[in-house]
């Protein structure tokens, strides 16, 4: 009796990367690529159409983020399996992905063998987080998280706004802005405002698209 291959779907903005995944998957007798999406909205609609066993996707997709795609699909299909494939190693990125419902979080430079093993593992209900990603989680697991307001303040700082402008935009006093910044520097172990922004972007606490807006 011939085993039914795992039905795989991919979602990534970069054609070359999608083509590479397609080539890897096509060489596996136990896997079949059923759909490829280029953005978040397409990923959502194609998943609902094809119902793949495992979906491989990046965090950053146009139209709708990969994390929003996961959360929306999980809401309708609780047993759906997701494996994130990205270049982002920040602990906050990983935490958000796992919270959204991803079963694995791999970097795009992962070796082919580990990728294929991870797809099969995720399909069987296991989690897959490589050591280099797990080490980032462990490093900051005891760190005090920034509050939503502190992230707002830091986002304003990242856009180059002075305390007075931040205070006006967030409808708070300048003293409150300063207090938030003091807490931010302490929590991130940052030397100054610029250092805090750099750390927050690297860890995924601040999203690049939010900073640019």
Mark where each language-model region is.
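Conserved acidic segment of CheY-like receiver
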Residues: 4-17, 21-25
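Short hydrophobic/Thr-rich beta-strand motif most characteristic of the beta2 strand and flanking loop
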Residues: 30-38, 46, 190
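Acidic catalytic/metal-coordinating carboxylates
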Residues: 39-42, 65-68
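Active-site residues of response regulator receiver
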Residues: 58-59, 86
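The feature encodes the CheY-like receiver
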Residues: 62
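Short, flexible helix-to-coil linker/hinge segments that flank and couple to helix-turn-helix
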Residues: 92-99, 103-152, 205-208
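Recognition helix of helix-turn-helix DNA-binding domains
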Residues: 162-195
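Basic, Lys/Arg-enriched C-terminal extension of HTH/homeodomain DNA-binding domains
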Residues: 186-213
